[in-house]
Design a protein with these regions (language model features):
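Solvent-exposed beta-strand sheet faces enriched in polar/charged residues
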Residues: 24, 33-35, 69-71
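N-terminal first-folded block
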Residues: 1-28
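A short interface-forming secondary-structure element
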Residues: 33-46
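Short, active-site-adjacent cap segments at secondary-structure transitions
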Residues: 29-31, 76
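Histidine-centered active-site/metal-ligand motif
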Residues: 29, 48, 64
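C-terminal structural segments of small proteins and small subunits
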Residues: 52-81
Length: 81
């Protein structure tokens, strides 16, 4: 069974404290905007690794593709959307 965007959002929220999260997708390919203080001081690859860690095995088994925009709260407030 393919996950819904709401389920992917919940999976990420369970493993990563998010200030804001939006997820869209078709059940196989998803796009996410994730705003988290956990991203402070981290580069893009490290931020994506945090999200992949939050998804765990689901990333391999349920989510086939995830395009992410990962921002700190300051970046989001500054308009880096």
């Amino acid at each position: 069974m393919e996950p819904t965007p709401a389920e992917v959002k919940r999976y990420i929220e369970q493993g990563l404290a998010c200030d804001r999260i939006e997820v869209d997708g078709d059940g196989r390919h998803f796009q996410a905007l994730i705003v988290s203080s956990a991203f402070e001081g981290k580069g893009r690859v490290q931020r994506h690794q945090l999200v992949y860690a939050a998804l765990g095995e689901r990333m391999r088994e349920e989510v086939h593709a995830l395009s992410m925009k990962t921002l700190t709260p300051a970046e989001y407030a500054g308009g880096s959307r």
